[in-house]
């Protein structure tokens, strides 16, 4: 009966098979399985089937499971950090970990307000540890606990503790805290849904180009999938999310008093994704529009915005001189759907939107990302992973001969033999131009 609860998918079949195996083991025991346990397992199946399977992130958590290292999941609010840990928690329970071995605390929940002090938190958790077994501790938005690093550090010293924490602000791993935890943590950077993950919510025969248009017009935030057919609800949700991030994670933490000026900077960055931006130029632009602002204030605002993960900054790299450049960066939004909420942009600028989508996918895949410069030409992305590099150009279309030439020239000028890619929305077969791989970007986004 349990197998019938799961639809004909690999994910459902796998979970149902685990549950069936569990039932068979219990039948061989002295006592019959309790009905409540069966119902619990059924609820776990239902929970898993409602979720988009975030395979890469789940694999990372499994890789570091039971290792003496703190798993720190970071990312913007509502990108799925809590859901990811909940999925992993349920996976542990299905695999035989007892509920007594798991402690889960969300510090945005008022019920957990008594533990917003490191001493109270440590005392409570230690008192409820299951002796003689591994204990799995899940702490959501841990940065809200005053002195949280002391509690984490003390719990880390216990042999039977496996720690998982989340945070929506880079403060979690900044300054003294990062120094204190050096060598004791691994950061798992979580983003809203990738295009490939988004496709899991759609029929297998969905039109891929229509799906991409929906992806960039609506949003990649997980909750939007539940309301995506109601445009007004999507806009209201994203507006509320944006306001929460700006007011709670930026204004409150940085004690910013001129909120209107901050929002002017936000709108400038959102309107200029994919363009080289210099702090002084932003300051001068604001001043020319009648909003006088000092360069150091712009710099502080941008720092606060990137720390809240709403924007990502990408420095420039001289591909020939092999060194970082001190001036000029590009900024990308964590979700292109937020752009219409921020500045009312409707359509247009699809080239920079595509570039933003590619940047986020590269960030998910790991490595240091830079904007490349070679002579007077620009390479959209240089990705460095250890000793390896890869170069990427992104273009809506290169079917025009002049456009093709313009996009290929910077890649052809690079004096090394690392992989080079030209990603476009032209739905053409893969072709190589003197070693440069041209690929349909929607296939690349799906790892095809």
Stretches found by the model and what they are:
Residues 84:
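Hydrophobic positions on the alpha1 helix immediately C-terminal to the Walker A/P-loop
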Residues 52-65:
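Pre-Walker A adenine-sensing motif
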Residues 81:
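Conserved lysine of the Walker
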Residues 104-132:
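Short glycine-rich substrate-engagement loop in P-loop NTPases that contacts/grips substrate
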Residues 162-168:
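Structural recognition of the conserved hydrophobic beta-strand(s) that form the central parallel beta-sheet
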Residues 36, 168-170, 174-276, 309:
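Interdomain motor-coupling "hinge/lid" segment immediately C-terminal to the ATP-binding subdomain
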Residues 73:
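Hydrophobic anchor at the beta1->P-loop junction of P-loop NTPases
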Residues 231-389:
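Accessory nucleic acid-recognition modules appended to NTPase machines
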């Amino acid at each position: 009966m349990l197998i019938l609860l799961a639809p004909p998918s690999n994910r459902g079949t796998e979970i149902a098979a685990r549950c069936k195996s569990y039932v068979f083991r219990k039948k061989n025991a002295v006592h019959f399985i309790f009905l409540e346990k069966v119902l619990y397992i059924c609820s776990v199946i239902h929970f898993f089937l409602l979720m988009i399977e975030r395979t890469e992130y789940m694999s990372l958590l499994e890789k570091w499971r039971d290792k003496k290292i703190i798993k720190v999941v970071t990312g913007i609010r509502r990108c799925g950090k809590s859901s990811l840990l909940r999925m992993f928690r349920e996976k542990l329970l299905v695999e035989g970990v007892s509920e007594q071995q798991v402690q889960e605390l969300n510090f945005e929940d008022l019920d957990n307000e008594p533990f917003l002090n490191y001493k109270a938190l440590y005392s409570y958790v230690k008192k409820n540890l299951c002796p003689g077994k591994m204990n799995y501790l899940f702490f959501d938005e841990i940065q809200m606990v005053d002195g949280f690093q002391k509690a984490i550090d003390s719990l880390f010293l216990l042999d039977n503790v496996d720690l998982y924490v989340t945070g929506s602000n880079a403060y979690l791993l900044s300054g003294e805290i990062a120094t204190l935890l050096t060598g004791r943590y691994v950061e798992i950077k979580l983003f809203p849904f990738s295009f490939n993950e988004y496709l899991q919510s759609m029929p297998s025969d969905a039109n891929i180009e229509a799906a991409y248009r929906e992806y960039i017009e609506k949003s990649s935030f997980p909750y939007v999938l539940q309301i995506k057919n109601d445009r007004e609800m999507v806009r209201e949700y994203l507006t509320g999310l944006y306001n929460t991030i700006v007011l709670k994670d930026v204004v409150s933490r940085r004690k910013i008093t001129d909120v209107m000026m901050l929002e002017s900077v936000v709108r400038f960055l959102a309107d200029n994704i994919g363009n080289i931006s210099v702090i002084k130029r932003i300051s001068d632009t604001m001043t020319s529009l009648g909003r006088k602002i000092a360069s150091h204030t712009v710099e502080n605002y941008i720092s606060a915005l990137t720390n809240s993960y709403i924007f990502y900054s990408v420095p420039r790299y001289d591909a020939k001189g092999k060194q970082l450049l001190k001036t000029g960066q590009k900024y990308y939004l964590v979700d292109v759907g937020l752009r219409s909420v921020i500045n009312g942009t409707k359509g247009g600028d699809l080239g920079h939107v595509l570039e933003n989508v590619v940047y986020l996918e590269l960030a998910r895949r790991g490595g240091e990302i830079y904007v490349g410069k070679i002579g007077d030409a620009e390479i959209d992305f240089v990705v460095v992973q250890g000793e390896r590099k890869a170069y990427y150009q992104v273009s809506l279309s290169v079917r025009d001969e002049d456009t093709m030439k313009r996009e290929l020239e910077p890649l052809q000028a690079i004096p090394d033999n690392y992989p080079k890619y030209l990603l476009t929305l032209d739905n053409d077969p893969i072709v190589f131009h003197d070693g440069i791989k041209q690929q349909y970007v929607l296939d690349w986004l799906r790892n095809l």
